[in-house]
Amino acid sequence: MPTPSSASQHVRTVLMLLLANVFWGLSFPLIKAIAFAHQQLLPASGSWLITTCTIAPRFILAAAILAVWQRGALLRLTRSEIRQSAGLALFASAGMLFQNDGLQFTSASTSAFLTQLYAIMIPVWVALRARRLPPAVVWASCGLVLAGVAVLGRFDWRELRLGRGELETLISSLFFMGQILWLERREFAGNRAMPVTFMMFVLEAAVFTALAGALLAGGAPRAAAMPVLFMSAPWLGFTLALTLFCTVGAFSLMNTWQPKITATEAGLIYCLEPVFASLMALVLPGLFSRWAGFTYPNETLTLNLLIGGGLITAANVLIQLKPLPKP
């Protein structure tokens, strides 16, 4: 029987991880709001430029905040920590590139639920790598996810295709799967979380700054026009919120509190991220629009969202309740 102190610690841990999921859920409508603000300020921007200009400031600021907050702990990174950071940054950068671009072509709620594909693909990958067939629970979860994807993405059965936003989100989820698998490699077990997170932020900032520079060099708008973003209070406000809450806050909470509970319980808590995203997308877009002066209507609880999101959430809960052993 747990002692009162251990029970209190467990409740606090669950609450902190729930808060991390609230922050991650907030990121979906926030990223769409940043895209609308950017398009309003620089109408000649393409979706890829908007994507890189959304992500680069986020990680530049996040790295700067961690550099001040954790300055003593960030010194003397080991070779293993640098290698882990590089792998995480590679997978995360690719995932965020497709996810953020896809968000410009689908709703925040749909993106949040489709991103959860990685929760199902990880046990499939583990089973295939071990050269064994996935167990029945994995097949059942895959069936639920495929049905949920078809409903959420309004899959066109005549042309056999998904929309651009839904397809890019599914691609991003595969890279996020790679990020999680890289994070869990046994060779990195002794690495320190905060220095690895800091270096990951630095590398992601460098990647997206370089991509933004390349896009600006190749077309409109000109680089000289970019300072208009930093003179916009709404764009700055959305970017600061994305950095403080959805980047530094969410990652710090996860790194601090997730080790205190089982992976199964943490996985179940993380299934709530798209639920929080959907709830916030019902009210925040209208508030963001009134402040920034663009048109971003509140989402509604459609039958597609309820059925598709419900199927994907059920699949994630099922796979977490019957987890596969680690390889």
Give the predicted meaning of each segment.
Residues R71-S111, V151, T243-I261:
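Specific transmembrane alpha-helical segments of multi-pass solute transporters/efflux pumps
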Residues V11-M16, S45-V68, A140-A147, R164-I171, ...:
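Hydrophobic alpha-helical transmembrane segments of multi-pass integral membrane proteins
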Residues K32-S45, Q104, G153-G163, L216-A233, ...:
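Membrane-interface helix termini and inter-helical loops of multi-pass transporters
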Residues V22-G25, P29, I60, A89, ...:
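Hydrophobic/small/kink-forming positions within alpha-helical transmembrane segments
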Residues P2-P4, I55, F59, R154, ...:
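C-terminal-most transmembrane helix of multi-pass membrane proteins
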Residues M1-C53, L90, A94, F98, ...:
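Glycine-/small-residue-enriched transmembrane alpha-helix faces in small-molecule transporters
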Residues C53-A56, I60, F98-A136, I171-S173, ...:
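Specific alpha-helical transmembrane segments that line the substrate/conduction pathway
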Residues T115, L128-V151, L162-E166, G286-A314:
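Loop-to-transmembrane alpha-helix entry segments
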